[in-house]
Amino acid sequence: MVREKVKVSTRTLQWKCVESRRDSKRLYYGRFILSPLMKGQADTIGIAMRRALLGEMEGTCITRVKSENIPHDYSNIVGIQESVHEILMNLNEIVLRSNLYGTRNALICVQGPGYITARDIILPPSVEIVDNTQHIATLTEPIDLCIGLKIERNRGYSLKISNNLEDRSYPIDAVFMPVQNANHSIHSYGNGNEKQEILFLEIWTNGSLTPKEALHEASRNLINLFIPFLHVEEETFYLENNQHQVTLPFFPFHNRFFNLRKKKKELAFQYIFIDQLELPPRIYNCLKKSNIHTLLDLLNNSQEDLIKIEHFHVEDVKKILDILEKK
């Protein structure tokens, strides 16, 4: 563990790591300070950083398992101590480190009896395991077990949607969140109008990256969000008597749904749930948080309603329609 005394600069804004430790292979802790800040700035930065650390960071997870040995995900396999559900839960706990984009395949192919750990996973070159000792299963008899794994990099979380059971493929709830927790606190000093603040930021990670790396990545993500404002043309717009008010062009949302209804009259949209569509995790989570559970719910929302959904974009509607038209 590394711990340093806090020295406050009275002039230049500076940040510093004042405590760093590794509690285990899958738990890192870091404590940072930023000072000096004017009154109110510490809370503004602290809230933004915490949200960026917990919601904007990308992680790598096992998202799907495929094996001819598994009849269904709540079954038991002769010669294996754990149930299939327990094996899937153990695979869900595996912590991976990578910078991959898209998806990759991995493989477990072992012969019993013996213990299967994360060390037995055959990974692509771009992926590595944080803790090789993580337990997966126990083979009690001399059987062969081969399991195919799908690895993805994303952010947030992805709820499993069981729709490919015919090919013995089983999804896993994936949590793409390398930062397990983040807190901020504020210390004020000085008197009167000269009062200043120190921001303390605590970060816990799962070992796939260090707290310092997480802080840098979250900072870059926040900077990228604000960059477009730096390029806004310096023009002043005056809206007098609504003369220059611009109406958003009608997005052909309902038109495309109407065409879908004509082609697929047998579909009852109120019975088609968004869980069935294999939507990207961000789109799925946005809709769920807005109580949109079926296609009918989606259709009953106006363009203005959809745009008001946090983190939801017009392009996301197009993605949903593209998926529907392929069904």
Curated annotation (Swiss-Prot):
It is an enzyme of class 2 (transferase). SUPFAM superfamilies: C-terminal domain of RNA polymerase alpha subunit, Insert subdomain of RNA polymerase alpha subunit, RBP11-like subunits of RNA polymerase. One of its GO terms (cellular component) is mitochondrion. Residues 1-233 are annotated as: Alpha N-terminal domain (alpha-NTD). It holds the Pfam family RNA_pol_A_CTD. Its EC number is 2.7.7.6. It is found in: Plastid, Chloroplast. Residues 267-327 are annotated as: Alpha C-terminal domain (alpha-CTD). One of its GO terms (biological process) is DNA-templated transcription. CDD domains: RNAP_alpha_NTD. GO terms for molecular function: DNA binding; DNA-directed RNA polymerase activity; protein dimerization activity. Keywords: Chloroplast, DNA-directed RNA polymerase, Nucleotidyltransferase, Plastid, Transcription, Transferase. InterPro entries: DNA-dir_RNA_pol_insert, DNA-dir_RNA_pol_RpoA/D/Rpb3, DNA-dir_RpoA, RBP11-like, RNAP_asu_C, RNApol_insert_sf. The N-terminal domain is essential for RNAP assembly and basal transcription, whereas the C-terminal domain is involved in interaction with transcriptional regulators and with upstream promoter elements. DNA-dependent RNA polymerase catalyzes the transcription of DNA into RNA using the four ribonucleoside triphosphates as substrates. Belongs to the RNA polymerase alpha chain family. In plastids the minimal PEP RNA polymerase catalytic core is composed of four subunits: alpha, beta, beta', and beta''. When a (nuclear-encoded) sigma factor is associated with the core the holoenzyme is formed, which can initiate transcription. HAMAP family: RNApol_bact_RpoA. This is DNA-directed RNA polymerase subunit alpha.
